[in-house]
């Protein structure tokens, strides 16, 4: 295994659980930092990539932003490549801020405002409300509105136990609207 030149490690449940480092993994990374190219992958879109850099740094891992892989990157490429300019997000404030930062030309509708949405973008929403669900479900009843999801994880690991994640929300929307996302950007999807 040590003859590999690059490792891509998941974060939640592999490098840490919540704010608790998984010490064996951290020790392995630090022991081989100078000889192996480490990158870190997370489907968890409820936190900005800079949050992951800061968390890893606090654990002693000298990570930089270019080593963090997130489904937001291919999502933005898809939005740009398909000329989607207005989205209704089902995601928390950090996710919305990340969309606005990475694609300033994107019109990210405020919650409760759904007029003009070209796509519903579903992420891991730690601030989910019934109002968000209602607006998204009504939008998804229109086949002209694209349905995109950042990742299919059913649960997110936490120290308290598994928590509902975007895949669980996808099941909710499928039950309510009959639709599944046209594109899913996080692992294990392409």
Language model: regions and residue ranges:
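HAD-like aspartate-dependent phosphatase fold
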Residues: 1-11, 15-190
């Amino acid at each position: 295994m040590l003859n590999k030149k690059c490792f891509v490690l998941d974060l939640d449940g592999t490098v840490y659980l919540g704010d608790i480092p998984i010490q064996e993994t951290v020790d392995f990374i630090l022991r081989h930092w100078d000889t192996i190219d480490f990158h870190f992958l997370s489907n968890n879109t409820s936190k900005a990539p800079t949050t992951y850099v800061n968390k890893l740094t606090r654990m002693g891992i000298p990570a930089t932003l270019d080593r963090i892989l997130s489904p937001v990157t291919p999502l933005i490429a898809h939005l740009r490549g398909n000329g989607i300019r207005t989205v209704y997000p089902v995601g928390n404030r950090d996710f919305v801020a990340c969309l606005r930062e990475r694609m300033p030309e994107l019109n990210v509708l405020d919650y409760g405002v759904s007029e003009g949405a070209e796509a519903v973008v579903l992420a891991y929403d730690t601030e989910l409300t019934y109002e968000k669900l209602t607006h998204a479900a009504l939008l998804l009843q229109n086949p002209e509105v694209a349905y995109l999801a950042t990742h299919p994880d059913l649960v997110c690991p936490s120290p308290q136990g598994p928590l509902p994640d975007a895949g669980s929300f996808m099941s909710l929307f499928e039950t309510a609207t009959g639709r599944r996302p046209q594109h899913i950007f996080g692992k294990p999807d392409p």
